C-alpha cells in the first residue's frame, strides 16, 4: 500500500452551524418576547377589551379604560421594538464582520486574510 492512499484531512468545522443556530434561537426568543401579550384580561367571558374600549348592545354597556403604564415601560410599544430591532441588526452586522475578518488557514498552507 502506498503512502498516497491515506491522506489526512482536517475535521469538519461546524462553528458556523452553531453560530447560525445561536443567532436563530436569539432571534426567535426576541420575537416571542416582543410579540406576546402581557396585558391583563379585561372584560367578561364574552367581551375581551384588553386595550380599553367601549361596547354597547341592547342590554349591556361596557366601558373599560386602556391600561395605564405610568412610569413602567412596555416592550410592546413601537419605540422600544424599533430600538431593539436596530440594536439587534447592528450586533448581527458587527458579529458577521468580526467573523469574516479572521485569518483562515487555506488547504494550500497559506494564511489568507479577507481584508
Curated annotation (Swiss-Prot):
Chief localisation class: host cell
Gene Ontology cellular-component annotations: host cell endoplasmic reticulum membrane; membrane
Regions of this protein lying in the Cytoplasmic compartment: 1-13, 96-115
Positions of transmembrane segments: 14-34, 75-95
Pfam families: Plant_vir_prot (PF01307)
Subcellular location: Host endoplasmic reticulum membrane
Assigned keywords, A-Z: Host endoplasmic reticulum, Host membrane, Membrane, Transmembrane, Transmembrane helix, Transport, Viral movement protein
Cytoplasm found in the keyword field: no
GO biological process: transport of virus in host, cell to cell
The family this protein is said to belong to: Belongs to the Tymovirales TGBp2 protein family.
Function: Plays a role in viral cell-to-cell propagation, by facilitating genome transport to neighboring plant cells through plasmosdesmata,.
Record's miscellaneous remark: TGBp1, TGBp2 and TGBp3 seem to act together for cell-to-cell propagation. TGBp1 is the main movement protein that physically cross the plasmodesma with the viral genome. TGBp2 and TGBp3 would facilitate TGBp1 function.
The protein, known as: Movement protein TGB2
Amino acid at each position: 500500500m502506498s503512502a498516497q492512499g491515506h491522506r489526512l484531512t482536517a475535521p469538519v468545522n461546524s462553528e458556523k452551524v452553531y453560530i447560525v443556530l445561536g443567532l436563530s434561537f436569539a432571534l426567535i426568543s426576541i420575537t416571542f418576547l416582543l410579540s406576546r401579550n402581557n396585558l391583563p384580561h379585561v372584560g367578561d367571558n364574552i367581551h375581551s377589551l384588553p386595550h380599553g374600549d367601549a361596547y354597547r348592545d341592547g342590554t349591556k354597556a361596557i366601558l373599560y379604560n386602556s391600561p395605564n403604564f405610568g412610569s413602567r415601560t412596555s416592550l410592546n410599544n413601537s419605540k422600544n421594538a424599533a430600538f431593539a430591532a436596530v440594536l439587534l441588526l447592528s450586533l448581527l452586522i458587527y458579529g458577521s464582520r468580526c467573523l469574516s475578518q479572521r485569518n483562515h488557514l487555506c488547504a494550500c498552507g497559506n494564511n489568507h486574510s479577507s481584508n
